[in-house]
Amino acid sequence: MRLIVGLGNPGARYARNRHNIGFMAVDEIARVHRAAPFRRRFQGEAAEVMLGSERAILLKPQTFMNESGRSVGEAQRFFKIPLADVIVLHDELDLAPAKLRVKLGGGNAGHNGLRSITALCGNEYRRVRLGIGHPGDKALVHAYVLNDFAKSEEPWVEDLCRATADHAPLLAAGEDASFQNKVHLAMAGRGWETVKTPAEAGKAKARDAN
């Protein structure tokens, strides 16, 4: 069994925030693979799903981002899932928009959801890093992640979540390299090989106007 966690903040106010792309991806996995309805459990919302031959629990912690580890730890203990079989989907500032990378363990890069999970559960879990790009200035990060995706970003966000969902059985099977490659090819095929952040797009537009 796998525990697949999407990180985000609960409530309509945060639903389309960049910080909530983990929730969006897990919702799409649930939709594509016809998961059971989400129920309130483990200080979050949880649903069972079959991904290929692997049974998985989808989890969206409802504790707010900074306390995500409480929810993850509760679900992990209940199902007795090894930490290596916990997979966390989260927004990644240090990855270009529309890119995806999978890694095991490592640092938290200032991500408070990961920091909470690491503190309460340990570090050797798999992370699916969903690139949202960086606003360019550290002082802008807080507002950037807690703002909604711009309208111009929504198409690639939807396509990234769909590609993640389509190939989730590979992720559940532990075939991380194949999963990552399939998502990359799907995104390239949809024209998302190079995507600028809104700030980068604005600068490029200003340069073109001069």
From Swiss-Prot:
PROSITE patterns: PEPT_TRNA_HYDROL_1, PEPT_TRNA_HYDROL_2. It is found in: Cytoplasm. GO terms for cellular component: cytoplasm. Keywords: Cytoplasm, Hydrolase, RNA-binding, tRNA-binding. It catalyses: an N-acyl-L-alpha-aminoacyl-tRNA + H2O = an N-acyl-L-amino acid + a tRNA + H(+). TRNA binds at residues 14, 64, 66, 112. PANTHER family: PEPTIDYL-TRNA HYDROLASE. Monomer. It holds the Pfam family Pept_tRNA_hydro. Belongs to the PTH family. One of its GO terms (molecular function) is tRNA binding. The record marks 9 as: Discriminates between blocked and unblocked aminoacyl-tRNA. Its EC number is 3.1.1.29. Gene3D superfamilies: Peptidyl-tRNA hydrolase (3.40.50.1470). This is Peptidyl-tRNA hydrolase. HAMAP family: Pept_tRNA_hydro_bact (MF_00083). One of its GO terms (biological process) is rescue of stalled ribosome. The active site is at residue 19. The record marks 91 as: Stabilizes the basic form of H active site to accept a proton. Hydrolyzes ribosome-free peptidyl-tRNAs (with 1 or more amino acids incorporated), which drop off the ribosome during protein synthesis, or as a result of ribosome stalling. It is an enzyme of class 3 (hydrolase). The keyword tRNA-binding applies. Coiled coil: none annotated.
